[in-house]
Amino acid sequence: MIIKIIAGAAFLIIILIILYTYTLFQAQKSPLNSPANFLKESAQSKNNKTVVCIGNSITHGRVSYNYVNILSDDLSGHGYHFINAGINGNLAYNVVKRLDEIINCDPDYVTILIGTNDANASLSKKNSVRYMNDMALPEEPNENFFGKNVEELIFQLKKRTNAIIAILSLPPIGEDIDHIAYQRTKEYSVIIRDVAQENDVDYLPLHENITEYLISENHRPRLSYENGFRRIMINGFLSHFLLGTSFDKIATSNGFLIVTDFLHLNHRGAKMVADLIKNWIFK
C-alpha cells in the first residue's frame, strides 16, 4: 500500500514538472516577428517602414497581451513592418547588451518600453538578488543603474541608426495608486521622461494615461503586491497556457482593469500602448 502511495505521488510530481516545464517553454517562445527572424528573411519589402519595438515580457507578448501584434494587424497594410524585440525578464541593461541585432534591422522607427523589471527589482532585497542572478547584472539594480542604461540605450540607437525614437513611460506595478510598487513605476517614469528630454527623443505618457483611466474608474484593487505577486503571476501563466484562459479573464479574476498579475497587461492595457505608438507614428 505504501509503495502504491509513493508511486502515485512520484507520478503526480512528474506530471506537475512536465506541465510546469511546458508552461515555461511556451512563455519563452520567440515571436515570429523577432529581429533574428527578420534578419533571416531573404526578401524584405523595400517599400515598408521598419518599426522595432524594444522591451521585456510586456513587449514579447507571450505572458502579456501582445501590443506589437495589435500594431501589426492595424498598420501592416499601411506600409509598416513591425519587429518584436521584447525578451522576458529584461532590464534596460540587458537591452543594451543585445543592441547589435536590433541595429542590424536598420529600423526607421524604434519604440522603447523598458523598466518594469528595473522598478520591480528595486522593491526588495530579495527581488534585487533574484534579478542580479537571473539576468546576470553587474551591479545592484537601482535608479542610477536604470537611468544610465536607458541613456546608453538611446545614445547607441541615435549614434548607430537613423531611426526616429520614442520611449514610453511604464505601466504600473499593480493598480493601487498609493502603493510603493505603483509609485516606484512613477518614479522610474520620471527618469524616462528626463532622459528623453535630455536626448531629444519623443516621450509617450503610458503611465500617465493608465493612472488617469484608473482614477476615472474610481478603481480599488482587490489584491495587494504583498499577497505574493510571483505566485499570482505564475498561476496566471499556468492558467493561460494549460487551460487557455485569456489575459482579460485572468485580469478580471484578480480584480484588475489593466494588468493581469501586477506586471503584465490585458487587452485594454496593450491597446493603450498600441494607440500611443500608432498616434506617434502618424503624427
Question: What do the PLM-derived regions correspond to, one by one?
Answer:
Residues M1-I14:
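N-terminal Sec-pathway targeting helices
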Residues K4, N94-F282:
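Alpha-helical cap/lid subdomain in secreted, periplasmic
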Residues I14-L16, G61, E140, Q197:
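Generic detection of intrinsically disordered/low-complexity segments and helix-coil linkers/edges
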Residues L16, Y20, K158-T161:
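Non-cleavable N-terminal signal-anchor transmembrane helices
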Residues L19-Y109:
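Serine-esterase "nucleophile elbow" of acetyl-processing enzymes
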